[in-house]
Amino acid sequence: MDILFVLSAVPHTSPWSTQVAMVMITCNLLAIVAGRYAIKVRGLGPSIPVSGVEGFGLPELLATTSLGHVIGAASILGLSNVGLIS
């Protein structure tokens, strides 16, 4: 397979910038807030050493930030294709 063909199929993405970082941080925070209230069975794994988050442990944090990164990557690709972030 020709490498130029593969490279032509990859969409143009914006380089890392403050705008890209803010989109990713916002998506992760929204996923954490949504997961805090949406996860029914909580507190089964190890806890995180942050006060005020009883019942929200390491498994919940990893799950919500994983979802936040998926949403953030899709948002960054979409916003850069539309031209709202550069």
From Swiss-Prot:
Membrane topology field: Multi-pass membrane protein
Domain of life: Eukaryota
DNA-binding among keywords: no
TM annotation in the entry: 20-39, 61-79
A Gene Ontology cellular-component term: photosystem I
Principal place of residence: plastid
Name the record gives this protein: Photosystem I reaction center subunit PsaK
Protein's organism: Porphyra purpurea
Organism lineage string: Eukaryota, Rhodophyta, Bangiophyceae, Bangiales, Bangiaceae
